[in-house]
């Protein structure tokens, strides 16, 4: 089973791109997810999780969500590889979002 559930704030506005070969829309964004444990200075730390969504979900995220919004994401963890311009193999770990829920804007949280 490969299932991820995250709640965090969008770190910047999402970016959407249409894939030329398929015509599918892909939207990428990153959310900051607070850790439950504080560091040695007593401060909260966060993990910055890259998320990719496709199709209608991608269109809705790009249209309605912005930096600072609190969102819930459910999906799966994916690791993919590619070769860079020097021929080196690179690995990318990301969440492929199947559902994204708008929870609140940054203004509502204040």
From Swiss-Prot:
From the record, give the transmembrane residue ranges.
none
Q: Name one GO biological process term.
A: DNA replication
**Domain SSB per the UniProt entry, residue ranges:** 1-104
Listed Pfam families = SSB
On whether DNA-binding is a keyword of this UniProt record, the answer is yes
* Single GO MF descriptor: single-stranded DNA binding
Could you list this entry's UniProt keywords, alphabetically sorted: DNA-binding
Q: Which InterPro entries match?
A: NA-bd_OB-fold, Primosome_PriB/ssb, ssDNA-bd
Q: Per the record, GO CC terms?
A: nucleoid
Q: How does it assemble?
A: Homotetramer.
Q: Which NCBIfam families match?
A: ssb
Output this protein's name. Single-stranded DNA-binding protein 1
Its ancestry begins with:
Bacteria, Bacillati, Bacillota, Clostridia, Eubacteriales
Gene that this polypeptide is encoded by: ssb1
């Amino acid at each position: 089973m490969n299932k991820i559930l995250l709640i965090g704030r969008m770190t910047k506005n999402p970016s959407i791109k249409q894939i030329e070969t398929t015509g599918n829309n892909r939207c990428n964004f990153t959310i900051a997810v607070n850790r439950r444990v504080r560091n040695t200075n007593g401060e909260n730390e966060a993990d910055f999780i890259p998320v990719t969504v496709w199709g209608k979900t991608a269109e809705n995220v790009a249209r309605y969500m912005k930096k600072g919004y609190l969102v819930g994401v459910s999906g799966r963890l994916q690791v993919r590889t590619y070769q860079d311009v020097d021929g080196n193999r690179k690995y990318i770990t990301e969440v492929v979002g199947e559902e994204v829920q708008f929870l609140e804007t940054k203004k509502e949280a204040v």
